[in-house]
Amino acid sequence: MSVIEINHPLIEHKMTILRSVDTDTKSFRENLNEIAKLMTYEATKNLKLETTEVTTPLMKTQAYTLQDKVALVPILRAGLGMVDGILDLIPTAKVGHIGVYRNEETLEPVYYYCKLPTDIASRKVILVDPMLATGGSAVYAIDYLKEQGVTDIIFMCLVAAPDGIARLLNKHPDVPIYTAKIDQGLNENGYIYPGLGDCGDRIFGTK
């Protein structure tokens, strides 16, 4: 598939706020949700529509409604920070959760929780995690979703490292990646640089 880096002046401006070490928890959380909302516009432009008829105050006319049923799946916990912004645009989406954390020594994903809609296999899944670093968590989550019968997945993140992009495309070339920024790389601890720090900690004020 492909990697789509979404370029937009509002996203650029809000990403600068997120990157700054001086941004407080409230502002970080708000801007993260706003970026997620802006990205959703681009990431959903290929949703399928079906024709219908609507009666306006003047006459009947042809109109369109969403044919695709959407499920939003954040990778816990940082993915939760993108949920509200996306739901603002797709309020009918069902929401599942996949809990994966990264072992800080091996940098490999460790699974701890999953709860998905019962009809997940029939839905277009938007998988979200703000950071695509090594790609381990995203690959694990997509593996799991496909095991549940999901065939239509897109992955959305705010910041992606080349290593994570390469790993995800190698394992799941059918899954498009939408990101606000492609950063330089990973440091010795597996963190994206220049990045924006530990996104989960900055969302929830835990560090």
From Swiss-Prot:
Transferase as UniProt keyword: yes
Gene name tied to this protein: upp
GO BP of this protein: UMP salvage; uracil salvage
Free-text comment on the cofactor: Binds 1 Mg(2+) ion per subunit. The magnesium is bound as Mg-PRPP.
GO CC annotation, single: cytoplasm
Family: Belongs to the UPRTase family.
Upper classification of the organism: Bacteria, Fusobacteriati, Fusobacteriota, Fusobacteriia, Fusobacteriales
CDD domains: PRTases_typeI
Catalytic activity: UMP + diphosphate = 5-phospho-alpha-D-ribose 1-diphosphate + uracil
Binding site for uracil: I192, G197, D198, C199
Enzyme Commission identifier(s): 2.4.2.9
Naturally occurring in which organism (per UniProt): Fusobacterium nucleatum subsp. nucleatum (strain ATCC 25586 / DSM 15643 / BCRC 10681 / CIP 101130 / JCM 8532 / KCTC 2640 / LMG 13131 / VPI 4355)
Residues involved in 5-phospho-alpha-D-ribose 1-diphosphate binding: R77, R102, D129, P130, M131, L132, A133, T134, G135, G136, S137, D198
Cofactor: Mg(2+)
Keywords: Allosteric enzyme, Glycosyltransferase, GTP-binding, Magnesium, Nucleotide-binding, Transferase
Pfam annotation, one family: UPRTase
Pathways per UniProt: Pyrimidine metabolism; UMP biosynthesis via salvage pathway; UMP from uracil: step 1/1
Protein name: Uracil phosphoribosyltransferase
Entry function: Catalyzes the conversion of uracil and 5-phospho-alpha-D-ribose 1-diphosphate (PRPP) to UMP and diphosphate.
One MF annotation (Gene Ontology) recorded for this entry: GTP binding
Activity modulation notes: Allosterically activated by GTP.
Presence of the UniProt keyword Lipoprotein in the record: no
